């Protein structure tokens, strides 16, 4: 009746049962949510909502997110969320669609026009499926790509198409969009729920005054908490290990908090001085992880080139091509 449709293809991480399926309707039937990502602190939010009288059928973070919107509203909910997400929330009562993207934009959110229809998705491939989406290449976006190696938000490789800015909410009234009131620039209606500059200014106003030892202790605590939150899943969890400082620390913290060997994955390059696989192997051996290596040749890399448009949606200067097939093959075996 409102001319709005939500669809979702789920990558199941939490609550693999049908109770976690999306799009999901809130308990009061006012809201319908489809989102890509994960709310890492959903357990804490769930406990707070349960104390306020909310009841849950399953244990997915999607259900918690919906209950939070019912209790606190979307803006306050997003301010409380620790996670990565691109979401679409339909308000059945007010006939308003809200699109939101996480603070630093880990998850993309594309939206634009297919003829006179507003379309959106966390991948450009979703927009391409609309029969009226035939938007050509945006020349300004192409210029940004050649200069920066990627296309920053709000620009998009397609004309009349945009990426939602990180930390923003876009609210669209269904009647206004249907009447063309958005004038093909709905991005002008974006509102920030988080601002990096303001966060930096707050940090500068209250600088850390402890000792070096206290700083190390606090950093260790923050990192361990961050890793623990990301390990919550109803499916096996793995980690990409290069042998460098960052991935080695994350792997060590994962293994310290796991009662089973952590699945680690690394890639190597035959006959190359860039090969870090031996370093990763040493770390994996030291930590007693379940380690998998994938060696890549020049021919392997060339064979991937035809699949790049499907991988990236937009043109993107990135060489991390073989980090995903290895865990996928491991899961299949």
Map each language-model feature to its residues.
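Cysteine-centered catalytic environments shared across enzyme families
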Residues: 1-312
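Short, intrinsically disordered, charge-balanced linker/junction segments flanking boundaries
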Residues: 314-324
């Amino acid at each position: 009746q409102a001319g709005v449709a939500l669809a979702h293809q789920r990558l199941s991480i939490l609550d693999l049962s049908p109770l976690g399926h999306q799009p999901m309707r809130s308990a009061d039937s006012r809201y319908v949510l489809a989102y890509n990502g994960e709310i890492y602190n959903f357990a804490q939010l769930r406990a707070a909502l349960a104390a306020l009288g909310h009841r849950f059928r399953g244990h997915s973070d999607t259900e918690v997110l919906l209950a939070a919107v019912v209790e606190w509203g979307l803006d306050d909910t997003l301010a409380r969320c620790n996670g990565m997400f691109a979401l679409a929330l339909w308000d059945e009562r007010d006939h308003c669609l809200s699109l939101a993207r996480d603070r630093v934009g880990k998850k993309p959110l594309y939206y634009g026009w297919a003829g006179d229809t507003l379309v959106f998705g966390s991948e450009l491939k979703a927009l391409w499926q609309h029969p009226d989406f035939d938007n050509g290449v945006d020349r300004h976006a192409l210029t940004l790509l050649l200069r920066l190696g990627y296309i920053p938000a709000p620009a998009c490789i397609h004309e009349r198409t945009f990426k939602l800015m990180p930390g923003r909410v876009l609210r669209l009234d269904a009647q206004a969009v249907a009447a063309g009131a958005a004038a093909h620039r709905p991005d002008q209606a974006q509102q920030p729920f988080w601002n990096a500059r303001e966060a930096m200014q707050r940090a500068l106003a209250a600088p850390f005054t402890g000792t070096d030892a206290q700083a190390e202790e606090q950093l260790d605590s923050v990192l361990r908490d961050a890793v623990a939150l990301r390990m919550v899943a109803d499916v096996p969890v793995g980690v990409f290990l290069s042998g460098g400082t960052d991935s080695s620390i994350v792997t060590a913290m994962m293994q310290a908090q796991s009662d089973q060997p952590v699945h680690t994955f690394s890639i190597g390059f035959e006959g190359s001085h860039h090969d870090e696989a031996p370093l990763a192997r040493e770390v994996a051996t030291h930590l007693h992880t379940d380690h998998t290596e994938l060696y890549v040749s020049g021919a392997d890399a060339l064979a991937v080139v035809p699949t790049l448009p499907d991988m990236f949606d937009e043109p993107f200067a990135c060489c991390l091509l073989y980090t995903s097939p290895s865990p996928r093959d491991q899961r299949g075996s």
